[in-house]
Each structure stands twice: as structure tokens, then as C-alpha cells.
Amino acid sequence: MRTSQYLLSTLKETPADAEVISHQLMLRAGMIRKLASGLYTWLPTGVRVLKKVENIVREEMNNAGAIEVLMPVVQPSELWQESGRWEQYGPELLRIADRGDRPFVLGPTHEEVITDLIRNELSSYKQLPLNFYQIQTKFRDEVRPRFGVMRSREFLMKDAYSFHTSQESLQETYDAMYAAYSKIFSRMGLDFRAVQADTGSIGGSASHEFQVLAQSGEDDVVFSDTSDYAANIELAEAIAPKEPRAAATQEMTLVDTPNAKTIAELVEQFNLPIEKTVKTLLVKAVEGSSFPLVALLVRGDHELNEVKAEKLPQVASPLTFATEEEIRAVVKAGPGSLGPVNMPIPVVIDRTVAAMSDFAAGANIDGKHYFGINWDRDVATPEVADIRNVVAGDPSPDGQGTLLIKRGIEVGHIFQLGTKYSEALKASVQGEDGRNQILTMGCYGIGVTRVVAAAIEQNYDERGIVWPDAIAPFQVAILPMNMHKSFRVQELAEKLYSELRAQGIEVLLDDRKERPGVMFADMELIGIPHTIVLGDRNLDNDDIEYKYRRNGEKQLIKTGDIVDYLVKQIKG
């Protein structure tokens, strides 16, 4: 490709509305342009990267035995009503109508469509297992699209769906998809972790997220410093302290704390160690309970894990925090003064709180706290559960090492769905015993457009993108200095361009009438891994300057050796 016949569209300045580095660099490198909130046009450089990602995904899915299909973006509402998700999915589901006022949706996912296909196409257990995938546009009406293509409303996704007659068969395909995803992200040169995850609104019995480690990530990824254990923070178990609860050394006293409405204020004003404080959070109780609210207690320096809390049998789903009005109606005190002593509703405490002694908590009287509280002396030990987020340094749940926490960007997610959708849509086949058998399902997604942004978040420097070789838009950039004035430079540039292309190497020849500084800046910005610079001064010595983008190292290579050198670097 020649720049004179290409839309480079690079920008010198960073657009003001671009928050994260991938959004900034994708705009500056001429990869995308914003059309409307959460909607982007992909320009030639972006499309080239996108296709590289797609191709790797497609190759590994095919290698794993999955079969490619293509389903409509527009889906009839009847399928969503049949599955129950028409009401459940919420405002992210974009509902539309055709000219006959028949309701449809723009597909955010395709479980209903593929299950409908299978229930009409398959009839016998002998046809299974089967795993279908597509690479298709999705639309989710995000309330606040942000971070460019990282959280856009329209995006490209690889979604796969497998069908089975047994849990054992599902597990085999699930394991194959786990391995395929690991190969996909390894081939792309990404630093990632596969972590145990909550199944969320998709449902099912088991799931793993594939997280690209990056400081800008929205998820906390937890992993052991010595073993293979890894989990999303929502699912990571906080192990109970091994040490027995220390004996009481203080009497419980009622203390006036009129200006201490938060743990931070309490700690600062009364010089308390934060690990000797407890915070109390009130949430709605499950429907039918004899109490309207449930009190959840975690240590002052810990955070409530809302996913764990929602799974408590006493707690309403979705988890809903009580308003101040609701709290006062039950406890007769405000949110800053709550604690376990004389709490008139059910209490659940975290494992760490159960191991505390001589601690401070609200007195359930406005502007007052109890100091020196001890379990079973001042208040009976309530129900104990794991309801907090783990923190760095906690013991690993597998008993090996301690936990580290890094930020991650979710680029893939695999689920064991079970029979959730097949039961709702009555997808069954004749089993081996001759009876009708509901199908067991798995689903497996990769955010193709998000992978591009995540790769940038992991691979950039002050000059621009530093693509992993496997997904770079071009493999080699040829920069001929003063090409339009030097016949020797022009002739060599054309010769090398032809020879490299003949070797199957993707080359961008910068044949613009631009200053060298502009040419260098653009090639570094768009992140082409290998650059060769042709100039009269080096050619006097039969030399060509070669530069590797990732480490910035330069070297002079003889003109006659440059093609073989590049082929070796790229193809090994």
C-alpha cells in the first residue's frame, strides 16, 4: 500500500473528549471517527487491525471444531418474550418496530436466535454435540457510552453457542473453548488472565472471563502470586482469618460522635485504627421476609462485595441499598450511626468481622458510637458469611501464596448455560433412550472491537501505538527520504516495495511529499513494527537504516541483505 493511495488521517492533537489512551490513539492514528454517541466509523488502518483480530479468532474457532454461521442483527420480539428476557433485559435492549408496527430488537446477543434455529434443525442426540459461532455486529443501548470502542453501543463480537445432551459433553466443549481463547489471546501477544467469574444476567452454572491486564481496566482481577488461581474480584473468596479472636481488653462504652458520619471521620477524630472499626450497610430483604431490611457488616477498611451479598438467602435480588428514610423507619437512626448492638433486624457479618474484638461501631443512636464492642459479651455473634472484596495480601483461596490485584479489561467470557434457554424455548432432541431430552448449552463470547482497544492499552509509548506483530496494520514501513528529488532513493524504494510484497509481507510505502519528521511521527503513531529508512547519505555506503518499533533500536543493514533480514524478523 502507498500512502498516496491510502487514507492515513493522522492527528497531531489529542481530541478533548478522548479519556483513555486507546481512545486517544485510535483517533490520532486515524483508526476510527465518532459518528454519534457510542457509534464509530472504522477507517482503513482500524479495519486492517480489526481484520487481523477477526482472522486469528476465526482460525482458532475453526481449529477447535466450531462451525461458522451468520445470524440477523434484527430479531423478532417473540423470541425474547418466549425466553423471558423481553422484560428482564432492561433499557440496554433497543426495541424497534417495522412498518407493520411489529416489534423487533437490535440484537445485543443471540442466544434466542441460535436456540430457535437448533430446535427446528436438530432432532436426534446423534447430531450432537455441535458448536456454532459467528462474528457479527451487536447493539447495546449503553446509558453512558465511553472510552471509545471499549464501551460503545455498536460493536463487533464473536459469539459461539454449543449444544449437548450431557453435562460431560458440555464440559469437554467448555474446556476446548477455554484452550482456544488462551491460544487466541496468546497469538495476539496480549498479557491476559483467565479468571473465574460470576455468570451475571446471562445465567448458568460456571463461567470464566479473559482479562487483558491494563491500568485503565474497569475490572479488578485477583490472582495468586505462586499458583494458577485467578478470579474476578466479584467471585474471589475472602478466607476467614486463621488466628483465633483475641480476648476482650476493653469495656463497651457509649461515645458521643456528632461529627463522625463516616469511618474516615471516626478514625481521624478519635485516633482509632481503621481495622478496629466496623461499617454497617442496610439492604432490602427478600420478598416475603418478616423484616424489611437486612444489616450487613464489614470491617472499616474493607468493601462490601455486592455479588456475594446478593446471593445471601435473606437479601433481595437485585441488591438494593436502603434509603435514609427506610433506615430511620426501622432503626430510628441515620446511616452514619449504625451498628450490631440492639439492631432490630437480621444481621450478617463478614468472616473478618467475626474475628474482631474491642471494635467500634454505630450505636443505632444518632451521633453516638459504641467503642470496645466484643462478640458474645455485648452482642450475640450473628450469622457469618464471606461478603467482602478480597484485598492484596489476602491468602489465596487455593491455599497457595497470597493474592495480587490488577486492573483488567474483559475481552472474552465463556459460560456453561445449562438448560436456561433451551427449556424456555423448548429446544430438545430425541435422546438415546428414545425420550425427548432438553439440550444443555454453553456460550462463548469475544469482544472483537474491544480487543483492539485493549491491545493498545497494553502496548503504547509517548510516540504512539506499539502493536504486537500479529495484529499490526502493516508489518513494514518504507520511508524514502526526498524520494521525489533522488532517483536512486525512489528506485530502491520501489524495488524493495515489490520484493517485500512478493514475500507476502504487508508494506506501507510512504511516498508523500512530506518532511521526514512528519513521516517518522506518523509511522510511529500508527505503530508499524518494522521501519526501513532510505537516504542518500547511507546509500553512499550501501546501507539502509532499520528500526524496530518496540524497543526503538536502530541498525544499519546492507542494501542486499535487507529483504532477507526483514523476512527472517517477520516470519522467523
UniProtKB/Swiss-Prot annotation:
One of its GO terms (cellular component) is cytosol. GO terms for molecular function: aminoacyl-tRNA deacylase activity; ATP binding; proline-tRNA ligase activity. It comes from the Bacteria. It holds the Pfam family tRNA_edit. It catalyses: tRNA(Pro) + L-proline + ATP = L-prolyl-tRNA(Pro) + AMP + diphosphate. Its EC number is 6.1.1.15. One of its GO terms (biological process) is prolyl-tRNA aminoacylation. Keywords: Aminoacyl-tRNA synthetase, ATP-binding, Cytoplasm, Ligase, Nucleotide-binding, Protein biosynthesis. It is found in: Cytoplasm. Gene3D superfamilies: Anticodon-binding domain, Bira Bifunctional Protein, Domain 2, YbaK/aminoacyl-tRNA synthetase-associated domain. InterPro entries: aa-tRNA-synt_IIb (IPR002314), aa-tRNA-synth_II (IPR006195), aa-tRNA-synth_II/BPL/LPL (IPR045864), Anticodon-bd (IPR004154), Anticodon-bd_dom_sf (IPR036621), Pro-tRNA-ligase_IIa (IPR002316), Pro-tRNA-synth_IIa_bac-type (IPR004500), Pro-tRNA-Synthase_IIa_type1 (IPR023717). Its main location: cytoplasm. Homodimer. Consists of three domains: the N-terminal catalytic domain, the editing domain and the C-terminal anticodon-binding domain. Catalyzes the attachment of proline to tRNA(Pro) in a two-step reaction: proline is first activated by ATP to form Pro-AMP and then transferred to the acceptor end of tRNA(Pro). As ProRS can inadvertently accommodate and process non-cognate amino acids such as alanine and cysteine, to avoid such errors it has two additional distinct editing activities against alanine. One activity is designated as 'pretransfer' editing and involves the tRNA(Pro)-independent hydrolysis of activated Ala-AMP. Belongs to the class-II aminoacyl-tRNA synthetase family. ProS type 1 subfamily. This is Proline--tRNA ligase.
